[in-house]
Regions:
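A conserved mid-domain beta-alpha-beta active-site/ligand-binding segment of alpha/beta enzyme cores
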Residues: 92-156
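A structural signal for short, hydrophobic/glycine-enriched beta-strand patches
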Residues: 1-110, 160-165
Length: 165
């Protein structure tokens, strides 16, 4: 068997193999390259197949969850409900490792890149995705402790920010 190429295909394989969901019940967006496109394309798939979508359960990598939710809020109308659910919340130890009992997809460098990249994007400044920056997101309040941690890590390990700049 060939490995799936897109994230959508990976989830489809999981749905079929682990949960016995029929292929005919799975609709995939294999073309999006960002969160906004993914949500827009999902809405189009719902409309194309006349699938009611008054309620959406948003399940995402927990590091990407907040930005995905904020993006979805601006793409759905007030009559639609978004249930924001992170199935896994990784617990970070003081030494930077993830607790063993927390199954998680990312390790080491990639985890730090994702975490720093999300704070970078959520910020409402000239570099972020908020109204004062690129304008992709509404303003998001980031706790001061998170901002301080971001600054410390970004200052000591600037290579982790390289992917988002």
């Amino acid at each position: 068997d060939q490995l799936p190429e897109s994230e959508a295909e990976i989830y489809a394989c999981l749905a079929k193999d682990k949960y016995q969901i029929e292929s005919s019940s799975i609709f995939m967006d294999k073309t999006s390259t960002n969160t906004s496109e993914n949500i827009k394309n999902a809405i189009q798939i719902f409309n194309d197949h006349t699938i009611k979508h008054e309620t959406m359960i948003l399940i995402q990598d927990p590091i990407l969850q907040k930005r995905s939710y904020v993006t979805a809020l601006d793409m759905f109308n007030d009559r639609q409900k978004i249930i924001n659910y992170a199935p896994i919340i990784p617990k970070l130890n003081s030494d930077g490792t993830i607790e063993n009992d927390t199954p998680y997809l990312w390790e080491g460098t990639r985890l730090y890149e994702l975490a720093l990249g999300e704070v970078y994007r959520l910020r409402d400044d000239e570099n972020g995705y908020g109204p004062k920056g690129k304008g992709f997101l509404r303003h998001v309040d980031i706790p001061e402790e998170v901002n301080r941690s971001f600054e410390i890590i970004a200052d000591k390990m600037p290579e982790y920010l390289a992917r988002c700049q």
